[in-house]
């Protein structure tokens, strides 16, 4: 048997903060979000950033876009290491053009060695020393984004989570799921409802963000168990 074969979970240690942080290597989240009012120093555009204290990072995430909502959803489940790539809002002359531009910015590209959008997750290990293994783009994961997530998940040996975009029933969600054949992608449906303290009202909450947090929680505690049947904290079903 090779001497370098590893049995069990791998643990990584981050020593860049005031105290070392140890975590299961497979429990690291990689996420792409928008947030036009986020702190640009804490969340630069199209650059992977490692969050070792998600609760503190929420204070720099602003209130617009998907960033703050996604971080809050994750921290409701646990407080894992999260690699975040913030992308700019979509632009265009009409709603369809804006949506298309947003999709392009989320999927990203590699030009002259510069990684943007989801592609920036591929550079996380070289830049940050960690490899995200739980991937998602809460609130922005249409079919094109979900499709583009698959090869990234395969390269990172990760699991991607995406919403059943546009589906209004369980039967539609099942048909949507069947359009993807990759084992690295899990389709989530429906979204939840959660209280927004900024608006003092209930609103739809990203199920994918909660799935990311729950998966990290499970991998840090009982990694061989499935996610199904576990409660999502901080939200309720519609």
Feature-to-residue mapping (PLM):
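A glycine- and small-residue-enriched flexible loop/hinge signal that marks low-structured segments
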Residues: 2-24, 28-56, 72-79, 87, ...
């Amino acid at each position: 048997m090779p001497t370098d074969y590893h049995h069990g979970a791998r643990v990584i240690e981050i020593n860049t903060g005031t105290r070392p942080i140890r975590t299961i290597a497979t429990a690291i989240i990689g996420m792409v979000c928008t947030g036009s009012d986020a702190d640009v120093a804490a969340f630069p555009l199209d650059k992977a950033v490692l969050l070792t204290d998600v609760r503190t990072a929420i204070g720099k995430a602003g209130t617009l876009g998907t960033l703050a909502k996604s971080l809050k959803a994750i921290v409701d489940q646990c407080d894992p290491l999260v690699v975040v790539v913030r992308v700019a809002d979509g632009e265009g002359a009409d709603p369809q053009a804006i949506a298309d531009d947003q999709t392009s910015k989320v999927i990203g590209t590699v030009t002259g060695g510069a990684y943007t959008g989801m592609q920036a997750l591929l550079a996380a290990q070289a830049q940050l020393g960690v490899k995200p293994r739980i991937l998602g783009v809460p609130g922005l994961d249409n079919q094109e984004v979900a499709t583009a997530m698959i090869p990234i998940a395969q390269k990172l040996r990760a699991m991607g989570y995406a919403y059943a975009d546009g589906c209004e029933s369980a039967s539609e969600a099942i048909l949507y799921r069947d359009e993807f054949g990759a084992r690295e992608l899990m389709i989530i449906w429906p979204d939840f409802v959660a209280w927004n303290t900024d608006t003092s009202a209930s609103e739809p909450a990203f199920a994918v963000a909660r799935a990311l947090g729950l998966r990290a929680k499970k991998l840090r505690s009982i990694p061989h168990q499935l996610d199904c049947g576990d409660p999502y904290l901080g939200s309720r079903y519609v």
